[in-house]
Amino acid sequence: MLASIPTEHGLYLAAALFILGLIGVLVRRNLIFMLLSLEIMLNATGLAFIVAGARWGEAEGQIMFMLILTLAAAEAAVALALILLVYRRFGTLDADRLSRMRG
């Protein structure tokens, strides 16, 4: 299926998703939205690996995607636990407010 999609289109899509995720991390102040934006960035890099692997007919792109997927799952679990602790302690998920509380 990926053989019929031009490589450039897949890489453009991956770049667009990565940029959207980066904008989300930089613009949003809610920690959960920042985490979701980071997940979008990780999925964009995985898509780039899959497209590049499909271009040359190699399995390394899919292997790297599985590694990225595993890393994203572990990162999400740890980050959600930390976000829950921050919310219980400070009562907010706004990154600006948290940095002001720190002093």
Swiss-Prot record:
Q: Name one cellular component (GO) term.
A: plasma membrane
Q: Which organism is it from?
A: Nitrosococcus oceani (strain ATCC 19707 / BCRC 17464 / JCM 30415 / NCIMB 11848 / C-107)
Q: Where are the transmembrane segments?
A: 7-27, 31-51, 65-85
- Enzyme Commission number(s): 7.1.1.-
Q: According to the lineage, what is the superkingdom? A: Bacteria
Places the protein is found: Cell inner membrane
Indicate the quaternary assembly.
Answer: NDH-1 is composed of 14 different subunits. Subunits NuoA, H, J, K, L, M, N constitute the membrane sector of the complex.
The GO terms describing molecular function are: NADH:ubiquinone reductase (non-electrogenic) activity; quinone binding
Q: Output this protein's name.
A: NADH-quinone oxidoreductase subunit K
Output the Gene3D superfamilies linked to this UniProt entry: 1.10.287.3510
One matching Pfam family is Oxidored_q2
Disulphide linkage map: none
The coding gene here is nuoK
What topology does it adopt in the membrane? Multi-pass membrane protein
Which keywords appear in this protein's UniProt record, sorted alphabetically?
A: Cell inner membrane, Cell membrane, Membrane, NAD, Quinone, Translocase, Transmembrane, Transmembrane helix, Transport, Ubiquinone
